[in-house]
From Swiss-Prot:
The name this protein goes by in its record: Tryptophan synthase beta chain
Family per similarity comment: Belongs to the TrpB family.
Function: The beta subunit is responsible for the synthesis of L-tryptophan from indole and L-serine.
Keyword line: Amino-acid biosynthesis, Aromatic amino acid biosynthesis, Lyase, Pyridoxal phosphate, Tryptophan biosynthesis
Organism: Salmonella choleraesuis (strain SC-B67)
EC number(s) per entry: 4.2.1.20
Pfam families the record matches: PALP
Cited CDD domains: Trp-synth_B
Cofactor(s) of this protein: pyridoxal 5'-phosphate
Subunit structure, interactors included: Tetramer of two alpha and two beta chains.
Taxonomic superkingdom: Bacteria
Keyword Lyase: yes
Amino acid sequence: MTTLLNPYFGEFGGMYVPQILMPALNQLEEAFVSAQKDPEFQAQFADLLKNYAGRPTALTKCQNITAGTRTTLYLKREDLLHGGAHKTNQVLGQALLAKRMGKSEIIAETGAGQHGVASALASALLGLKCRIYMGAKDVERQSPNVFRMRLMGAEVIPVHSGSATLKDACNEALRDWSGSYETAHYMLGTAAGPHPYPTIVREFQRMIGEETKAQILDKEGRLPDAVIACVGGGSNAIGMFADFINDTSVGLIGVEPGGHGIETGKHGAPLKHGRVGIYFGMKAPMMQTADGQIEESYSISAGLDFPSVGPQHAYLNSIGRADYVSITDDEALEAFKTLCRHEGIIPALESSHALAHALKMMREQPEKEQLLVVNLSGRGDKDIFTVHDILKARGEI
């Protein structure tokens, strides 16, 4: 089987799907390759990003949390995007591709509900029918986002099978698509899954890093020492990293969720603590039991609660171009509180993992002069009840 683009990043990636889905993936790849060369498509995408989503997003210098250190810290404000997170960028691109292929329906999966909301808003805007699979447990945990999706006309389908979380929603969405791909486009929510999705999602998120590079050069006259982003599937991180990969002076740091601590097994850090296997249509590191079953991942943040990781991150890790670390629930929560109290910004719990690592770098070497950028991938409105319940249980409020 030949593809137009390389389906692998080193040994990672590929197209491990039932034969019935190969024509749909090939059609998607063809549409993407032709759209990338089509000035009309690019102009339409750029217009939506600017006038609907609100790009470019700001690069904000932290005023207070760096006090007592020689660190300069900037936040790339994807939280200011319409929809509240970076997810909006690539769904607009995929929805335009769906229209280009003559599809009338969108199928999506969602965990925290952010990708579901983004899929629903893009579908409403472009006149596409939308159905979203969501683990029954997540439907309960994320009721405001479920209501947002329904307000925008999407059908939300709770999935009760398995653990009733994101991985089960992914399985159901793929099952649906294999029977409906002639009329439906599967709007995958992260830079993972079968080729060509990891490449498409990266290209539709790469403006994060492109804007950051131009903005930091304008503000500081040089490139940052490191860019830092949280990694679940890895779309916000690859969007930030892509334009810096060839700038070898810039450190790329991905932050996986350490949950209750790596040693407890209750985490979501397959890159550093998983084994390579086949899942969700790709070859990548994943959390597995001793007999090779997919193990439940865990994080305080539903959006990082994914048992595998995008293949390009696996490749960047394997060649040593990017460093991947983990941050626990407690560390992320502390960073969340710090940003709220000292900068007046409420970050998503996902993004708080990246911020926590930047704070750690700063505090461990206060005398080190360093220029850091954290990708603030989303806003924390969706997380305030989770945080409230934890702080209440601890007697902090």
